């Protein structure tokens, strides 16, 4: 297994750690609940950066594989959708927005599975990558939940939802 594929798998492995730090407020080894959110943010940022890094490495060193073309967008969907569902639990995003995003992601994943069953691997498009970046930035802003950034957060979140449609 090559490095880009390992980074993609690493991104998926980080998801449960991200969720625990985001949603479990009273960890005895942390001074306060805010620490958990900041650690969750750091994990999410690292996972998001692996998304950018795995693709760059794969293209630069000609390490593109069918596994990577299929799993990389799926890992992104798992990361973003898990984060959005957790953020509903924290009351930071309306459930309807998450439903719109997840419905679209499931639909696209379904198309990918049908294509894969027929021996065709569909790589992520430019617009899909662009949408994912906006979703990831929106998630980061929703995690930190800084009141001064509320308007910016809402703007980026709306752009992410519109790009999703």
How would you label these PLM feature ranges?
Residues 1-165:
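Alpha-helical transmembrane bundles and membrane-interface segments of multipass inner-membrane proteins
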């Amino acid at each position: 297994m090559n490095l880009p594929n390992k980074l993609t798998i690493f991104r998926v492995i980080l998801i449960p750690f991200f969720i625990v730090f985001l949603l479990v407020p009273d960890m005895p080894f942390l001074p306060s609940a805010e620490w958990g959110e900041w650690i969750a943010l750091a994990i999410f940022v690292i996972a998001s950066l692996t998304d950018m890094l795995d693709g760059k490495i794969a293209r630069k060193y000609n390490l593109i594989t069918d596994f990577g073309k299929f799993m990389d967008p799926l890992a992104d969907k798992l990361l973003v959708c898990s984060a959005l569902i957790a953020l509903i639990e924290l009351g930071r995003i309306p459930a309807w927005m998450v439903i719109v995003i997840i419905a679209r992601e499931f639909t696209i994943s379904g198309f990918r599975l049908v294509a894969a069953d027929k021996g065709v691997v569909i790589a992520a498009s430019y617009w899909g990558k662009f949408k994912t970046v906006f979703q990831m930035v929106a998630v980061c802003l929703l995690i930190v939940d800084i009141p001064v950034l509320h308007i910016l957060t809402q703007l980026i979140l709306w752009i992410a939802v519109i790009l999703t449609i």
